[in-house]
């Protein structure tokens, strides 16, 4: 009882101390908070929908890409811009590739102040995070910006590829570590400096270091004790074909003495080579020693974004139909988890059940159509057979006359 009370008080204190900077569940008035970019005239449009299947129609409503082979650009301001200095930064949202996407992005951007009408793929951003699918590429993108450069994540964990809703969470901690979760399950973690090329390396190979002249690079050597067997060269490489016979029309006076054609000798052992043994002098692969990098500059603020002011989707999709929902930006993973429990976590089982039911109906419809087609083909074949029988009867009558 005391343990449960203590945990409850701890969670309550975390909730009191935490801050939710942005939250979006896409209610019917969502367009009052979001702006489609007009920087290009052919951008695709988002629409509000729960999709073809859902667990709860109201809770599962989100914005969906609605036009194939289109770029999309839409953003929403954060009421009060903020810096994540001294605290964690958590970005979370759900993605539902209902269309069984073949090529397209599903990522969200954290932005500085932006002119929403002019928002494009070239607009500077702080973070780009989320799934990316195109052909064999099925990965979670996590790009950070540092001093104006967009830095790719060294890791490429696989993203979810089914047509159900999945929640992606990125956590950048105040100690410069990070976590990536999918449906509240940790998929990756590490340090920013190790998993992004943010800073110059602390050490570099010494350009003055040279490989010693007596360094042995070969891991194996010829066995000096191995000797070629005395009968190794006894058999020649080729021999006359023992199954060949002189043709009956062979004339030695005209054709010369007949000789059987030569064939490969199955007993020939080939060129003898002494066997290899481990080289006792082998020292391993040589590499120069590491020395401190004179260009390395420590920075304990690589995780800090001074002005986080908006969220936005900047996407390209070949086949539209992705639904985005339940965005939260906070400084507390516990808050993000609680939000998940209230939204996707609360409806995922019902959504899966609805999906399974829709798939069963689809299979039944396909089976009914297949049977109908088979019956029509069978009926057509029987009618053709009857026509053939009638023609044969008429031909028989004509023959009798």
UniProtKB/Swiss-Prot annotation:
Provide the alphabetized UniProt keywords.
Calcium, Chaperone, Disulfide bond, Endoplasmic reticulum, Lectin, Metal-binding, Repeat, Signal, Zinc
| Principal localisation | endoplasmic reticulum
Instruction: Give the domain of life.
Output: Eukaryota
Q: Where is this motif: Prevents secretion from ER?
A: 398-401
Secretion signal, residue range per the UniProt entry: 1-18
Q: Which GO terms describe its molecular function?
A: calcium ion binding; carbohydrate binding; unfolded protein binding
Q: Please report any disulfide bonds recorded for this protein chain, giving both cysteine positions.
A: 103-134
Annotated sequence repeats reside at 187-198, 206-217, 223-234, 241-252, 256-266, 270-280, 284-294
Q: Which residues bind an alpha-D-glucoside?
A: 107, 109, 125, 132, 314
List GO BP terms, alphabetically: ERAD pathway; protein folding
Extent of Acidic residues compositional bias:
246-256, 382-401
The region called Disordered is annotated at: 199-263, 341-401
Q: Where in the cell is it found?
A: Endoplasmic reticulum lumen
Q: Where is the composition biased (Basic and acidic residues)?
A: 199-214, 224-236, 348-381
Annotated GO CC locations: endoplasmic reticulum lumen; endoplasmic reticulum membrane
Which InterPro entries does this entry report, sorted A to Z? Calret/calnex, Calret/calnex_CS, Calreticulin, Calreticulin/calnexin_P_dom_sf, ConA-like_dom_sf
- Domain comment (free text): Can be divided into a N-terminal globular domain, a proline-rich P-domain forming an elongated arm-like structure and a C-terminal acidic domain. The P-domain binds one molecule of calcium with high affinity, whereas the acidic C-domain binds multiple calcium ions with low affinity. The interaction with glycans occurs through a binding site in the globular lectin domain.
Described function: Molecular calcium-binding chaperone promoting folding, oligomeric assembly and quality control in the ER via the calreticulin/calnexin cycle. This lectin may interact transiently with almost all of the monoglucosylated glycoproteins that are synthesized in the ER.
What is stated as this protein's family in its record? Belongs to the calreticulin family.
Q: What is this protein called?
A: Calreticulin
- Top-level taxonomy: Eukaryota, Discoba, Euglenozoa, Euglenida, Spirocuta
């Amino acid at each position: 009882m005391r343990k449960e009370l203590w945990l409850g008080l701890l969670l309550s204190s975390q909730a009191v101390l935490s801050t939710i900077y942005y939250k979006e569940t896409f209610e019917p008035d969502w367009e009052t908070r979001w702006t489609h970019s007009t920087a290009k005239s052919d951008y695709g449009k988002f629409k509000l929908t729960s999709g073809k299947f859902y667990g709860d129609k109201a809770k599962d409503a989100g914005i969906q890409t609605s036009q194939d082979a289109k770029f999309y650009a839409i953003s929403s301001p954060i009421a009060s811009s903020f810096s994540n200095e001294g605290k964690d930064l958590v970005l979370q949202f759900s993605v539902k590739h209902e269309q069984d996407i073949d090529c397209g992005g599903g990522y969200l951007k954290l932005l500085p102040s932006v002119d929403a009408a002019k928002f494009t793929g070239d607009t500077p951003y702080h973070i780009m995070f989320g799934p990316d699918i195109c052909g064999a590429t099925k990965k979670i993108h996590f790009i950070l910006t540092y001093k104006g450069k967009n830095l790719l994540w060294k890791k490429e964990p696989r993203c979810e590829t089914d047509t159900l809703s999945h929640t992606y969470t990125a956590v950048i901690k105040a100690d410069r570590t990070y976590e990536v979760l999918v449906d509240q399950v940790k998929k990756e973690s590490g340090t920013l400096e190790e998993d992004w090329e943010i800073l110059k390396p602390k050490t570099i190979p010494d350009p003055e270091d040279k490989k010693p002249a007596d360094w042995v690079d070969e891991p194996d050597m010829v066995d000096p004790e191995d000797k070629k067997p005395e009968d190794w060269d006894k058999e020649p490489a080729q021999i006359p074909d023992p199954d060949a016979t002189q043709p009956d029309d062979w004339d030695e006076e005209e054709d010369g003495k007949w000789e059987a054609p030569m064939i490969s000798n199955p007993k020939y052992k080939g060129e003898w080579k002494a066997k290899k043994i481990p080289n006792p002098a082998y020292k391993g692969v040589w590499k120069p020693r590491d020395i401190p990098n004179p260009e390395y500059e420590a920075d304990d603020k690589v995780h800090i974004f001074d002005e986080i002011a908006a969220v936005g989707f900047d996407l390209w999709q070949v086949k539209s139909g992705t639904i985005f929902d339940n965005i939260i930006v906070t400084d507390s993973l516990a808050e993000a988890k609680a939000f998940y429990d209230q939204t996707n976590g609360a409806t995922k089982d019902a959504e899966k059940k609805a999906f399974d039911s829709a798939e069963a109906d689809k299979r039944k419809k396909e089976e009914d159509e297949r049977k109908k087609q088979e019956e029509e083909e069978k009926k057509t074949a029987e009618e053709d057979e009857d026509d053939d029988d009638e023609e044969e009867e008429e031909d028989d009558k004509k023959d009798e006359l």
